[in-house]
Amino acid sequence: MKVLVINAAFRDGSRTAELLRRVMKEYDGHEIHEIKLSDRHSAPQPLDGDLLRLYNAAVGSRDFSSPMFAPASMFAAADEIVIAAPFWNFSIPAILHDCIELICTQGVTFDMSPEGEYFSLCRAKRLTYITTAGGYIPENDHAFGYIRDLCESFWCIKDIRYIKAEGLDIYGADIERLLDEAYHG
């Protein structure tokens, strides 16, 4: 099984990275590919004016040979996907959003029928979203909601697992216990 990990947990001592490490034990022996968003050389670049023009031209001509399409190609080819990102300002880190914008490439991860209906070009049937928060994540969680909506609308991924550890910065919090409870449900 080919597993793609999109890792937006790059702070030293990251509790999201620790939770990801625990989850990844489930995938021992599998083929793992990782997009490490902390690596400036390999992390996707934001679609600014110049890059957006190149992106649109390539999508229009269905030429996905540019390295900017690597995240989308990796996503489409994965059997399972794991995304790890801290809960920031009621959402996801900007660098993860930049990566997702490139993953949402028509002709690579999804396409549209002549009637205007989206259909998936992805192999994955399962996505695991991992997050941690110092406080408590509200019910109307924009971060997971965004990922879930993309899974259901564009990628036809119905098995969506949400692993979250919250309240980690609350005075007296037992961080190890909270991480264990998040992982073991």
Give names to the regions the model predicted.
Residues A8, L37, T131-T132, A165:
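Cofactor-binding loop segments of dinucleotide-utilizing enzymes, especially the Rossmann-like FAD-
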